[in-house]
Amino acid sequence: MDAVNAFNQELFSLMDMKPPISRAKMILITKAAIKAIKLYKHVVQIVEKFIKKCKPEYKVPGLYVIDSIVRQSRHQFGTDKDVFGPRFSKNITATFQYLYLCPSEDKSKIVRVLNLWQKNGVFKIEIIQPLLDMAAGTSNAAPGAENVTNNEGSPPPPVKVSSELPQAPTNSMPAVPQLPSSDAFAAVAQLFQTTQGQQLQQILQTFQQPPKPQSPALDSAVMAQVQAITAQLKTAPTQPPEQKTAFDKKLLDRFDYDDEPEAVEDSKKEDAVAVATTALATAAPPVPAAATPAVAPAVPASSATSPPPPQAPFGYPGDGMQQPAYTQHQNVDQFQPRMMALQQDSMQHQVPLPPNGQMPGFGLLSAPPPFPPMPQPGMPQPGMPQPGMPQPGLSQPGLPQPGMPQPGMPQPGMPQPGMPQPGLPQPGLPQPGMPQPGMPQPGMPQPGMPQPGMPPTPPVQPTFQPTFQPQNEPHSQKPHQQEMEVEQPCVTEVKRHVPESRKSRSRSPKRRRSRSGSRSRRSRHRRSRSRSRDRRRHSPRSRSQERRDREKERERRQKGLPQIKSETASVCSTTLWVGQLDKRTTQQDVASLLEEFGPIESINMIPPRGCAYIVMVHRQDAYRALQKLSRGNYKVNQKSIKIAWALNKGIKADFKQYWDVELGVTYIPWDKVKAEELESFCEGGMLDSDTLNPDWKGIPKKPENEVAQNGGAEASHTEPVSPIPKPVPVPVPALPVPAPITVPPPQVPPHQPGPPVVGALQPPAFTPPLGIPPPGFGPGVPPPPPPPPPFLRPGFNPMHLPPGFLPPGPPPPITPPVSIPPPHTPPISIPNLVSGARGNAESADSAKMYGSAGPPAAPTSLPTPPVTQPVSLLGTQGVAPGPVIGLQAPSTGLLGARPGLIPLQRPPGMPPPHLQRFPMMPPRPMPPHMMHRGPPPGPGGFAMPPPHGMKGPFPPHGPFVRPGGMPGLGGPGPGPGGSEDRDGRQQQPQQQQQQQQQQQQQQQQQQQQPPPQQSQTQQQPAPSQQPAPAQQQPQQFRNDNRQQFNSGRDQERFGRRSFGSRVENDRERYGSRSDERDNSNRERREWGRRSPERDRHRDLEERSRRSSGHRDRDRDSRDRESRREKEESRGKEKHEVADRAGGNKAVEAPLSQVGNTDTVSELNKGEAMATVVKPEESPAEATSSVEPEKDSGSAAEAPR
């Protein structure tokens, strides 16, 4: 009984909905009924009770429930095992008596359902016929038709015909072969196989027999018979045309349970009429000439072939259409040849019937002629009978007679479809004294039927028809024809609203193609019918207004917005309830189910209840998710789920009474809510702006936007966040001296008003590739330095030198750097930024270091963009122009001689693209440091890698080489200190020997004087990066790139070489590790092998690797801490370093000699000038010193 109770609740919940009932609701009711099939008697009784008790507007939905249940049951269990159909049929008469209490405009829908049942054999004709008669009795048109038949005295034959129709179900159509081979003819043949069809054939033959001059009396008699038949057909004939049983498809699709149910019915009627006319036209030629007057009654059968007639009782003009054709017997002879030609044309799918201008494809046969779209102006369009326009004897309109001259192509003796045959002499079709009773007068366009201008529209339909014709099912084809006709009525409308009608048509064809003909037909008809219905109801309204309304409504439906209620605010929920979840289901499972539909704002899991509440960002996404997931059997963790709208959080308890769970909307009357409360309603939902009180309009917009973009807030948050990181890179431009600063704004343009302030977070504006001047810069202006590296702290001000440094040099130096920078300057600036990015802590540390180290360190570490600044620092030393970049004290200060940071010492100038460090720079590959592909940290581990990172010869590094990032660094990568470095560098045997010797000496010294070395290292962190380059091409770097290295750099490097610990023990330990590993076999041999070129490449790679490694390390807070500690220790050791500088320098000189004899001499000089820090010498020294340092360490340790 639970299933029964569930069905009962589901069914009676219809009362809570406004009529047109949605297809989704029908499906739910049908499923509930099928689940309760074991108690099917209860289900049937519940439905009957509902129909009996419900309001008139719910009668037709009740009928749709019966239809849906029976069809689904027949489809699912088979016609033999279906229990619902027989059970409903037991009390169906009483049920239909209640059904006919529906509004008059809904009766056509009931007839349509009956016709479908007859066509598909859902119920026997014996059951359906009385129901159709009942409908006829209730409709005005039916009585008129009956009168006509009575006049003829052939009413009984029609009745017989109707009874016969059931006997010869339209489903059985063996006679098809008799007709010419074509889909159209096949359909017609099937129709004719029925008894009614045979009668129609006879009638056609009868028409053929009489010559054109047939007496009007005969015509009138025939017409009377035809009318009688049509009246009967109105009751049941429509059924045959729709023989197609398509239970396979969503059975509910046939009916629109949607907003426009009426339209569907109308369309079906029209379709039936069209089919009948086409069938008649096609059949006429094939029909043997054995027509009997008595056959005339059979005409109803023919009309039956065109299901629309049954609807005629409702004033469906189409029914009478056939009659007019018959009335024009005189023309029949001429008419038939034309019909034949038309049929052939249609068979050939010659879409344009020249006469009609209609596409033959519609009718499948010569149906095109039947299409009234071509009716003469003022003549009702056949097949376009307006529902609600009962035309009691009018048979002409709905059924264009086959062979009937298309409008503009009146065929003599051929009734114009939609042209009243009865007292309307048709041009070329004079029917003397044969006015059709109830036939619309030619001058009487049928209401709702576009008269003139119809012809143009037909072509549109034809295009669709062909798509249908391919379908072999005669019924589907007929329906298509009917559809075409139906739409034709809208042709005038189409003209006016060409876009819409075309849209609907073009859309419907697609639907037809993809779905069963019946459904597509319905949808198309629904549209066209609804249009005609609208015309009837709102004739005064402009069609353009209707079209706009329809389009707006369609857009709203697509957005998932519910119907608008007057003076009611709609708060549309974007919250979905998903139930029957397995308790093991996780948020990720639910998110994966719904994220395909759109962004999810939040997911609230309630495992004990096995459900979740999902708030989607957009209503449309939630609507699509609900539509899709509610139809299929979707599973999460192998368990089927349920999904429904959930009341959004913003709705307070007071307003829950207004919640509509079916539509997922809370309709709150304007007078119940205050404008200021609206915003609070948006949580988990959105306001429908179209439903807001104009007085509030301003207020809601805000909430609405927020709601509509429930993710909006998130997005904004996200943006700010991302900008911050991005800005970090941007700041670099600020590094340049003030002049550059002015220029930089363009780089940072989007977010950084003043590039100078590196610290300010810069939105995600990225500077163009460094090589290209930013948009704002003139060609002559040096490009601003590259944006700060991502790690640069937003607040970092490149212009601000560390405490120990002089203020930035005068701008002039900048210009020289500009010339120098071509490739390198930006990278250098980046290093500064790097330090900044690391954070203020780093900058502070670096500042400490700088204070202790003094300017020399700065020049060493950051030569590039800050060059302008460094110039001032180094300006004294004359390094200003070229070296200025190299000398950037500020950058050094930022990075500091930080143990952890590799003083990024890059040759001045823009870094090569591969070295440039802005991940966002489009042109550049990810900067090496950014990539985590570097070898594991070198001997130093993550500890403070030796600062010497860069070997002089290679192109500058990514803006910042991380400690250990530079191959040359003693840091973790292969570098001068690393094993790979050794391999990379080819030194001449002499150099190797010297280096080894020096290394040994240095190691000893280091052990003795670790602090001084460390301090020196601090002072000259940058040079350490460039050791290799110096060896390779010491002079080159001396000239411009590495001029900043101090003579004491070698020792400093060695001091640093301890790899993160300045203690000699550590150094020995790390050094031995690296030396043993790298140097054990390779020391001399590898050094000897190395050539500057090889070193250069190796260094680049190593640098990139290390920089990546170092970068990561630096970022690591632990690394920073260790660096800080080391820095502090260095600060202490700096004094010692100064004391021991002499000894170290002595050592360094030999080392430099090892690297290069030239370097050695310069190193000696450098040593003397260590305090001064000459850029030229320092680079050479640094490079040479670094390598010797490593070599010596390794040599000394290896023996150990």
Swiss-Prot record:
Cysteine disulfide links: none
Composition-biased stretches (Gly residues): 965-978
Biased composition range(s): Polar residues: 140-153, 1153-1162
Record-linked InterPro entries: CID_dom, ENTH_VHS, Nucleotide-bd_a/b_plait_sf, RBD_domain_sf, RRM_dom, SCAF4_RRM, SR-CTD_assoc_factor
Molecular function (Gene Ontology), one example: RNA polymerase II C-terminal domain phosphoserine binding
CDD domains assigned to the protein according to its UniProt record, in alphabetical order: CID_SFRS15_SCAF4, RRM_SCAF4
Pfam family, one: RRM_1
Pro residues composition bias: residue spans: 367-390, 399-461, 856-868, 927-958
Composition skew (Basic residues), residue ranges: 504-541
Domain named CID: residues: 1-139
GO cellular component: nucleus
Primary role: Anti-terminator protein required to prevent early mRNA termination during transcription. Together with SCAF8, acts by suppressing the use of early, alternative poly(A) sites, thereby preventing the accumulation of non-functional truncated proteins. Mechanistically, associates with the phosphorylated C-terminal heptapeptide repeat domain (CTD) of the largest RNA polymerase II subunit (POLR2A), and subsequently binds nascent RNA upstream of early polyadenylation sites to prevent premature mRNA transcript cleavage and polyadenylation.
PANTHER family (alphabetical): RNA PROCESSING PROTEIN LD23810P (PTHR23140), SR-RELATED AND CTD-ASSOCIATED FACTOR 4 (PTHR23140:SF3)
Assembly notes: Interacts with POLR2A; via C-terminal heptapeptide repeat domain (CTD) phosphorylated at 'Ser-2' and 'Ser-5'.
Protein's UniProt name: SR-related and CTD-associated factor 4
Record organism: Rattus norvegicus (Rat)
Lineage, uppermost ranks: Eukaryota, Metazoa, Chordata, Craniata, Vertebrata
